[in-house]
Design a protein with these regions (language model features):
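Non-catalytic, usually N-terminal nucleic-acid engagement modules in DNA/RNA processing proteins
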Residues: 10-69, 73, 79-84
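Extended two-metal-dependent nuclease catalytic cores across DNA- and RNA-processing enzymes
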Residues: 10, 16-17, 36-39, 89-212
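A short beta-strand-to-loop transition that corresponds to the Sensor-1 phosphate-sensing loop
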Residues: 24-25, 71-74, 146-149, 165
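Membrane-targeting and insertion segments and their boundary/processing signals
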Residues: 22, 26-30, 72-79, 83, ...
């Protein structure tokens, strides 16, 4: 999606275009558990869709980007499963009330002419990583909206990670540039990768180094 906003010139410097990248499944999941159950007249659950759109509109109002893209996971094995067969092996199946809302939010986004990207063999955050760095290389400012703190490894001077939290229908957002990651965790974004590798990740069933 390209938003209707003209580039402006301040002094001799051309303002950088801005793109917002949203981790679709991550934000939909957070909205589902953060917003009370809602259904339409046909009995379709809509709380995740409602919460997702609230978060998205809040971010768009704050950021006023020229571009917006939403990435989604594809329900298929990824290259990580080839490297480690038990990857996400202990994760519970997605709640049916949430699953039925995934195609709905995609349809809503496409109806709004918002670009939706998904690719078999890759996860949404893989796409976020590629897109964010390519956009940065083209001189753009990037805001990544995700509930997954693994995305903190992507933070730079021009790539901001925004982690929303929804409680009782209200959304608050934590912002992280590279300097913020260093201040909060005592490591750089690149070093954050090593920390995660050493610690492991119970959510993804990835074992860490014993005793760490």
């Amino acid at each position: 999606m390209k938003c209707n906003k003209k580039q402006e010139i301040i002094g001799e410097n051309l303002m950088r275009d801005k793109i917002v990248l949203i981790d679709g499944h991550s934000i939909l999941n957070r909205a589902f558990y953060g917003v009370p159950d809602l259904t339409n007249s046909e009995g379709l659950h809509t709380n995740a869709v409602y919460g997702f759109l609230n978060i998205m509109f809040k971010i768009l109002d704050e950021e006023k980007p020229e571009y917006l893209t939403v990435t989604f996971d594809v329900h298929a094995p990824t290259f990580r499963h080839e490297m480690f067969a038990d990857y996400k092996g202990t994760r519970k199946p997605m709640a049916e009330e949430l699953r039925q809302q995934v195609p709905v939010i995609k349809d809503v986004l496409r109806a709004m002419h918002i670009e939706v990207i998904e690719k078999a063999g890759l996860e949404a955050d893989d796409l976020l990583g590629t897109l964010s760095h390519r956009c940065e290389e083209k001189g753009m400012d990037v805001s990544i909206i995700s509930g997954d703190r693994d995305t903190l490894q992507l933070a730079t001077e021009h790539i901001k990670i925004r982690i929303p939290k929804t409680k009782q229908g209200k959304t608050e957002v934590e912002d992280y540039y590279a300097a913020d990651v260093q201040e909060r965790y005592g490591v750089t974004p690149k070093e954050f990768i090593d920390v995660k590798a050493l610690m492991g990740d119970t959510a993804d069933n990835i074992p860490g180094v014993p005793g760490v």
